[in-house]
């Protein structure tokens, strides 16, 4: 597919023109780190991100065709900006019933959701993992049956949520059954909103697993997480079933939560990525996925030969193909200890917690990255002692968190209220102010406005959270 790169072309032409830069930014194109000649602002011809009529509009139209959406909008401030705009738009499109607006959301949401709730002043009803689910802070599989039940329960209270919000893929690589969830939402007249920050590449797999293709009304993609894009580059995608389609309204929502000085370096990166995606990227993506699947099988075969208590590489139909999630229990250690061992072998992971290590690959990783990782893990496997016990099932910890959860005030009241930081072990009975997170994955254990319970303290201590903010 032939693809233009109008933003890249304009900026390069300007950089070569010798024009006196009597405008921002202050470096005037003089190289300090090397990128400065390409770093500009909204000069004549450069267009304007939140009211585009020229090169940005053309580039976004290219992205829209590539992703197959009703419209794909650029963000230079990551999925966090897109999440806030998406929720604002869902609120704007919802019928007004005189009640406080409520969102139905899976509990493993990024803290950006809570910040949006504080800014927009809506309530959240949580979808929790089943009591039998293996406990993990990052995971919250939602079934169509569970969603139907939650919607029915809200309806019995005379309430309809303005949206259903799920994270897919999650930080451990788990994916939701989006077609089934979308069907439930469609039947109930509620938009499905997806945090797809980790899944921009899904559109370019042969089977097209992108949320918009699977029925989501809106989703955010962090292009920078899985595509060759500079940090901060993201998309807000609208499906044809989005509750708001007016372009000015969408751009207004993005502008509400964005800087008036968007980075043209990031915009060029998003623009250049269009050409990559229109080229041989899908073929390279298939090759990368195949290499990772081969690595998973090889590692799990070796783990089975060593009689490890669990497979080393997490696998299954509900796992995205581009994350390699390692279960450190296979080696008899914690995820953080495994990450340290890999770091000594010059392998830096994306995320580690007491149980898991997450490694993110893309087609930009050279073959030697795969080879170095396999060699390091095979060396660790060779040292595994016989008779390791199976890891303890932690599902009870999360069931207790759900059972004990009590919302004492609104999220907005908690986030904006007077607060103080105290040690976790002294927080029992206090009300959580700012979300208590470790980052990554930036998923709260205790939610703003909730009482700090014994179960919350157990989980915070397990995930290394030593202090938290509570209301005074």
Where are the model-predicted features located?
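General small-molecule cofactor/ligand-binding pocket signal
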Residues: 73, 125-127, 350
């Amino acid at each position: 597919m032939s693809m233009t790169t109008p933003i890249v072309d304009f900026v390069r032409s300007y950089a070569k023109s010798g024009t006196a830069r009597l405008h921002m930014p202050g470096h005037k194109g003089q190289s300090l780190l090397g990128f400065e000649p390409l770093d500009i602002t909204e000069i004549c011809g450069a267009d304007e991100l939140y009211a585009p009529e020229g090169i940005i509009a053309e580039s976004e139209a290219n992205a829209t065709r590539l992703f197959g959406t009703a419209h794909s909008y650029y963000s230079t401030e990551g999925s966090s900006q897109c999440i806030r705009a998406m929720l604002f738009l869902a609120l704007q499109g919802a019928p007004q019933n005189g009640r406080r607006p409520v969102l139905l959301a899976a509990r493993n949401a990024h803290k950006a959701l809570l910040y949006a709730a504080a800014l927009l002043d809506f309530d959240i009803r949580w979808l929790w993992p089943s009591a039998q689910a293996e406990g993990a802070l990052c995971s919250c599989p939602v079934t169509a049956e569970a969603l139907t039940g939650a919607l029915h329960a809200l309806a019995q209270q005379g309430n309809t949520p303005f949206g259903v919000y799920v994270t897919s893929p999650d930080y451990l690589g788990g994916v939701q059954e989006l077609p089934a969830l979308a069907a439930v939402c469609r039947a109930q007249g509620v938009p499905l909103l997806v945090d797809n920050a980790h899944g921009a590449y899904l559109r370019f797999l042969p089977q097209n697993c992108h949320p918009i293709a699977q029925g989501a009304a809106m989703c955010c993609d962090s292009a920078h997480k899985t595509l060759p894009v500079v940090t901060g580059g993201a998309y807000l995608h609208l499906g044809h079933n989005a509750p708001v389609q007016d372009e000015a309204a969408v751009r207004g929502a993005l502008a509400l939560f964005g800087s008036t000085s968007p980075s043209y370096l990031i915009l060029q990166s998003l623009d250049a990525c269009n050409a990559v995606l229109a080229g041989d990227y899908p073929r390279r993506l298939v090759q990368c996925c195949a290499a990772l699947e081969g690595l998973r099988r090889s590692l799990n075969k070796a783990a089975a030969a060593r009689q490890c208590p669990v497979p080393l590489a997490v696998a299954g139909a509900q796992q995205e193909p581009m994350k390699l999630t390692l279960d450190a229990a296979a080696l008899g250690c914690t995820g953080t200890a495994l990450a340290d061992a890999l770091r000594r072998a010059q392998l830096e992971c994306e995320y580690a917690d007491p149980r898991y290590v997450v490694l993110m690959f893309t087609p930009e990783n050279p073959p030697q990255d795969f080879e170095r990782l396999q060699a390091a893990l095979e060396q660790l496997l060779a040292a595994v002692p016989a008779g390791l016990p199976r890891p303890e099932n932690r599902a009870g910890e999360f069931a207790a968190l759900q059972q004990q959860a009590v919302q004492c005030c609104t999220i907005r009241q908690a986030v904006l209220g007077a607060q103080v930081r105290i040690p976790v072990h002294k927080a029992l009975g206090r009300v959580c102010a700012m979300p208590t997170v470790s980052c990554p994955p930036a998923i709260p254990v205790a939610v703003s406005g909730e009482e700090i319970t014994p179960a919350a303290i157990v989980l915070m201590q397990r995930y290394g959270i030593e202090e938290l903010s509570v209301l005074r």
